[in-house]
């Protein structure tokens, strides 16, 4: 009986440790969901409370960077998460590097070739850092602020917060950008 208990305990301990060992991809996706989910929920709340969309622009201008910093403060020291795009609204905070641009161009090519799936998570080794990329597609609601027919009130708010804005003229289901988790080897 004691032998059975010892064997059962060993199996349970092994199972628990295997369950705790998540892959870098899974870890990155977890952090991406933390940022993406928080931003999406708060933005949707703004859109519900102000149907004009002006409040959403104000929210993005004043809160998106703060929320990104808050999410990053909850991550382990070896990890961070951020957003970027080819056509940016906030150049100073969300600029893309060469690797980001390469990945986004690959996503665009797969969209054009009709081989794209929104669940296409890319994992790229970059020195001692692994980057996990999740694509962000422009949904119909996004076009209120990122499309080609932006209301005057929204455009004024965008221009006030982002005088060098390039994040416009998207079409539904085009690549809006990516969320990137960067995880250092540890």
Model region roles, listed by residue range:
Residues 10-19:
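Hydrophobic h-region of N-terminal signal peptides that target proteins for export
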Residues 139-149:
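The canonical Cys-X-X-Cys-His
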Residues 19-139, 153-186:
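Extracytoplasmic c-type cytochrome modules immediately beyond a signal peptide or single-pass transmembrane anchor
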Residues 2-9:
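Sec-dependent signal peptide recognition
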């Amino acid at each position: 009986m004691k032998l059975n208990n010892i064997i059962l305990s060993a199996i349970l301990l092994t199972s628990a440790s295997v369950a705790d060992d998540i892959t870098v991809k899974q870890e990155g996706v977890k952090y991406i969901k933390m940022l993406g989910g928080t931003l999406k929920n708060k933005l949707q709340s703004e859109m519900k409370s102000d149907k004009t969309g002006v409040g959403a622009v104000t929210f993005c201008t004043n809160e998106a960077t703060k929320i990104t910093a808050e999410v990053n403060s909850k991550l382990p020291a070896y990890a961070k998460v951020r957003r970027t795009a080819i056509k940016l609204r906030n150049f100073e905070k969300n600029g893309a590097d060469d690797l980001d641009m390469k990945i986004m161009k690959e996503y665009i090519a797969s969209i054009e070739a009709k081989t794209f799936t929104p669940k296409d998570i890319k994992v790229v080794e970059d020195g001692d850092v692994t980057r996990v990329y999740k694509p962000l597609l422009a949904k119909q609601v996004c076009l209120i602020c990122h499309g080609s027919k932006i209301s005057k009130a929204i455009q004024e708010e965008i221009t006030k917060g982002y005088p060098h804005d390039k994040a416009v003229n998207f079409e539904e289901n085009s690549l809006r950008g990516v969320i990137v988790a960067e995880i250092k080897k540890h």
